[in-house]
Amino acid sequence: MTVTAQPEFGLHSVDATAPVEEITKVMKHHGGVIVRGLVSEEVLQQVGREIKPFFKRGNHEGPFCERTRTVCSIPRKSRTFVEKIFGNPVYTAVCDELLTAHHEAWVGGQYFKFASPPVYNSSVAFSTLPGNSQQALHRDDMDHHGKRPACDVGQYPIGRDSIVTLFVADSRTTKQNGATRWIPGSHLQHHLGKPDLSKEVHIELERGDAFIMLASCYHAASENLSDTDERIVYSAFTINSTYRQSENVFLSLPLECLREFSPWMQKRLGFSASSPLCGWIDLTDPREVLNLPEPSDLERYH
């Protein structure tokens, strides 16, 4: 496949009241977009009360520097995070447009069309302290073995990406205190295309701002070169429901916690089957087996 020269890529921002179509248009062209003021001060304060005490345990989970503290398995720790950040209506609508799985099939002589909305993939809260080292540039869809040919920006197809990432700033993030480095346009590369360091930009955010990004983009945390700044960012990841979730939420979230959420959120967390019947228990809707309200939204072929 011959790929023509790409137009200029860069970092763009929109207001949280912007139409979803405008947000996804920028994302398909550049790979990501800043959404100013996506999360309110009231929500941030409540999420902080629920999550920040876990930072004090000093956990350094996963492939991060020892000056990075993380909180994982957030659905069982912060209901507000799940409902107001992961479940933010702008982020939800963006994910629905970019990640809903569609399929068509013949069963005998009858033709069917199926659609499965995306679900929760994972979440991590990050606290990066002064002295935090630079993270290597990477793509978030590595876990799912994302393979893609290069493509022209005008030809970006829905379904090319398996995950949409959300970063929400709890504190002001700057180049000095470790703001995320990102390479705009890298979502259009071949999956084995190397990151071009000359094109990286820093995602500088004010408290309550968010960055929504396609998981095929190269990005990484930067060094925290400040003397005193703690950079706190909340991240949420939503995935095409035909893929395996990175976080095993079925083991990390107790059923008694799950029941506190609305039926819609339970399904969004992955506690449902997808059309026509993927994720069953004994060939039965798992919500029926778990005695959860409202059945899965299935388009059955039998």
From Swiss-Prot:
SUPFAM superfamilies attached to this UniProt entry: Clavaminate synthase-like
Family of this protein: Belongs to the PhyH family.
Keyword list, A-Z: Dioxygenase, Iron, Metal-binding, Oxidoreductase
Subunit structure: Homodimer.
One GO biological process term: biosynthetic process
GO molecular function, one term: dioxygenase activity
Cofactor requirement: Fe cation
The protein, known as: Dioxygenase peniD
InterPro entries linked: Phytyl_CoA_dOase-like (IPR008775)
Disruption of the gene: reported phenotype: Does not affect the biosynthesis of penifulvin A.
Disulfide links within the chain: none
Residues involved in Fe cation binding: 138, 219
Gene3D superfamilies noted in UniProt: q2cbj1_9rhob like domain (2.60.120.620)
TM segment ranges: none
Function: Dioxygenase; part of the gene cluster that mediates the biosynthesis of penifulvin A, a potent insecticidal sesquiterpene that features a [5.5.5.6]dioxafenestrane ring. The first step of the pathway is performed by the sesquiterpene cyclase peniA that generates the angular triquinane scaffold silphinene via cyclization of the linear farnesyl pyrophosphate (FPP). The cytochrome P450 monooxygenase peniB and the flavin-dependent monooxygenase peniC then catalyze a series of oxidation reactions to transform silphinene into penifulvin A.
Enzyme Commission designation: 1.14.11.-
